[in-house]
Amino acid sequence: MEKSWFNLMFSKGELEYRGELSKAMDSFAPSEKTTISQDRFIYDMDKNFYGWGERSSYSNNVDLLVSSKDIRNFISDDTFFIRDSNKNSYSIYFDIKKQKFEIDNDLSDLEFFFYSYCSSSYLNNRSKGDNDLHYDPYIKDTKYNCTNHINSCIDSYFRSHICIDSHFLSDSKNSNENYIYNFICSESGKIRERKNYKIRTNRNRSNLISSKDFAITQNYNKLWIQCDNCYGLMYKKVKMNVCEQCGHYLKMSSSERIELSIDPGTWNPMDEDMVSADPIKFHSREEPYKNRIDSAQKTTGLTDAVQTGTGQLNGIPVALGVMDFQFMGGSMGSVVGEKITRLIEYATNQCLPLILVCSSGGARMQEGSLSLMQMAKISSVLCDYQSSQKLFYISILTSPTTGGVTASFGMLGDIIIAEPYAYIAFAGKRVIEQTLKKAVPEGSQAAESLLRKGLLDAIVPRNPLKGVLSELFQLHAFFPLTKNSIK
């Protein structure tokens, strides 16, 4: 590979740099005219040096290593010449095609030309006046942070071409350990480490950093979430999983919804130890039902697809059940039905208002008719709760709410509230189109369409939801335990 050296940058500080781009000199096309006020030199294919005064024809063909915009004019491999505080010299070379870093310690040829130029009489004897076009103020200014400047250029270049965030040349006591943290964006948009990405030295070919050292990214995945509509990043805790850029509503876990609605320190879960026993011994060639249950439990930390319990909402005691779509699609089996039934019976005995947050794909097919009978069982206890005891039940429909949940307790609330843009239906769009051989109109199963047709009472965003629920409860004579509990 032919090499062309240009743009020497150095200072009298602890670090000295030289930048290189591997590209033939005859392929350097003028990208834009630049005004050059610093003293620079060029090293061509015949290893001849030219100052800007001697070969002024290059002034329009070579850009300074000043910004990422200038670097982008040369799409090729990069090498940086470094001399650390311990007087050790080496270069970091990046091969774009192979995506590997290579640290080279054999720089005798480069050092010869570098120090020859630094000690030249032309450099030492030239004028330092204001009118001198060759005067470089950064050589005199030892406070100029060349390290940060180069790091910024490299970061911008790598981010714009191969989605790498790099932190080069850490100025530490052990300057030979210059760690390069690289985080490569996968197709799903999440940050992950590149498995085949290695850094090696020419001297001993030993790996300085391997893929195992990048567990840092896992810690940040808990703080940030990516919108699946516009792919923007947002902080989980502040935005309530609502994209601040496009307004798209992302899915929330049952624990997040409990935290959103219930006052801190007042949540008392019920029937946490209730698990499915595979009542019909469902057989599957792909994966046994018990294995799917175990896998979902490990992934979500839940025993089944619903959390039930009691707590306080702005000081008002309530009974709350929240379905979790991450647990087998929020499907309703015997455990889900039994937990919701027990919650309603407890709310009936204690005269508590009831909230059920629905997020489900329907009845769980692995439990057959036992899952279908949960629809009738829950509807039966709800009838006693609402009609006989005259208590107040609010149903909150989130995306998606379909199947047996929609056909039973999901649409039985005294007040039915939906989140914006929620997908609410009995049969899914694909099932309807395959059965009827007709296209389903776009948006006909969205919450906004159902509200216009009178199937919903209100569409409430997540931010004011807790306040709206509190006002509805007080309107129906459910008040806080103490006046000071209202926030």
Curated annotation (Swiss-Prot):
Co-factor remark: Binds 1 zinc ion per subunit.
Where is it localised? Plastid, Chloroplast stroma
* UniProt-listed GO biological process terms: fatty acid biosynthetic process; malonyl-CoA biosynthetic process
**Record domain CoA carboxyltransferase N-terminal: where:** 223-487
Cellular compartments per GO CC = acetyl-CoA carboxylase complex; chloroplast stroma
Tell me where it mainly resides: plastid
Q: What is the reaction catalyzed?
A: N(6)-carboxybiotinyl-L-lysyl-[protein] + acetyl-CoA = N(6)-biotinyl-L-lysyl-[protein] + malonyl-CoA
Q: What class of enzyme is it?
A: transferase
- Pathway membership, UniProt: Lipid metabolism; malonyl-CoA biosynthesis; malonyl-CoA from acetyl-CoA: step 1/1
State the UniProt keywords alphabetically: ATP-binding, Chloroplast, Fatty acid biosynthesis, Fatty acid metabolism, Lipid biosynthesis, Lipid metabolism, Metal-binding, Nucleotide-binding, Plastid, Transferase, Zinc, Zinc-finger
Zn finger (C4-type) ranges are 227-246
Q: What is its EC number?
A: 2.1.3.15
Q: Which parts of the sequence bind Zn(2+)?
A: 227, 230, 243, 246
Gene Ontology molecular-function annotations: acetyl-CoA carboxylase activity; ATP binding; carboxyl- or carbamoyltransferase activity; zinc ion binding
Q: Give the NCBIfam families listed for this entry.
A: accD (TIGR00515)
**Quaternary assembly:** Acetyl-CoA carboxylase is a heterohexamer composed of biotin carboxyl carrier protein, biotin carboxylase and 2 subunits each of ACCase subunit alpha and ACCase plastid-coded subunit beta (accD).
- Function of the molecule: Component of the acetyl coenzyme A carboxylase (ACC) complex. Biotin carboxylase (BC) catalyzes the carboxylation of biotin on its carrier protein (BCCP) and then the CO(2) group is transferred by the transcarboxylase to acetyl-CoA to form malonyl-CoA.
Q: What is this protein called?
A: Acetyl-coenzyme A carboxylase carboxyl transferase subunit beta, chloroplastic
Query: Which species expresses this protein natively?
Result: Barbarea verna (Land cress)
